[in-house]
């Protein structure tokens, strides 16, 4: 009868140890450090510069991708003055 009592108490502890991979909770929360290290190892590295967000300029230093930016903004972020100043340039780019 005593054997069953010990097994009854021992089985959950062994299972807990096997599931978590380590039984050393008393050494400075080793489980949380290990999990956070594993989680950061699985994160993908950020893309520093995507091709679509790269800007190219012509010889005068003007942005040659204004058409893309203009479509993305849909005229919401521009004032009327800026639109009237660049209307000719936009028309040329749209024609090309």
UniProtKB/Swiss-Prot annotation:
Modified residues (4-carboxyglutamate): 81-82, 85, 89, 93
Location(s) in or outside the cell: Secreted
Matching InterPro entries: Conantokin_CS
GO cellular component, one term: extracellular region
GO molecular function annotations of the record: ion channel regulator activity; metal ion binding; toxin activity
UniProt biased composition (Basic and acidic residues): 56-66
Calcium keyword on record: yes
Cofactor: Ca(2+); Mg(2+)
Region (Disordered): 36-85
Remarks, miscellaneous: The mature peptide does not contain cysteine residue.
Protein name: Conantokin Rl-C
Taxonomic source organism: Conus rolani (Cone snail)
